[in-house]
Amino acid sequence: MKIINCSYQIANRVLKRVQSWMGLNTVGARAIVTNADGKVLLVKHTYQPHWYLPGGGVKNGESTKAAIIRELHEEVGLIVSEQDVALFAIYQHSYLGVNDYPVIYIIKNYTSHIAYSREIEQMAWFYYDELPEMVSPGTKRRLNEYFANAPIAEKW
């Protein structure tokens, strides 16, 4: 696990340096997915120590809405209709000289099936007031905005 984590971090830093040098921006799509009990879905990747909102990068020519529908299906086995995807907020984030624009959606209606992703080590549902300790800082801020009605920030 440590080798995969270290390899990912090195590859990610190299990629971000190249993107920065080329002046590229990136766009990502993530979702606050809630269930009927009011719990939120979080994922833990094989290459990161924290819990995150599910989602990922937007492919060339793909809309952010299509990206979150695809990512939820690939990562956690959720099937979401386009009409059940509601925009929450768009943020700006800089990492290693690259501007990233995470787009967050709210998902309340979906069906699920068993999915296996090499990227996801663990997925779990949590009540907002019982989140695990290792939630990423950005994820925690987004959940505060949604569940505690904290002001929505512009920066990730």
Residue locations for each model-derived region?
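NUDIX/MutT-family hydrolases
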Residues: A115-F147
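A short coil-to-beta-strand element that immediately follows conserved catalytic motifs
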Residues: I79-A89
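Acidic, metal-coordinating catalytic segment for phosphate/diphosphate chemistry
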Residues: M1-R30
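Conserved Nudix-box catalytic region and its N-terminal flanking loop in Nudix hydrolases
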Residues: N35, K39-E75
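Active-site-adjacent beta-strand/loop module that shapes the phosphate/pyrophosphate-binding cleft
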Residues: Y91-I114
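Short, well-ordered beta-strand micro-motif
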Residues: V33, I104-K108, Y127
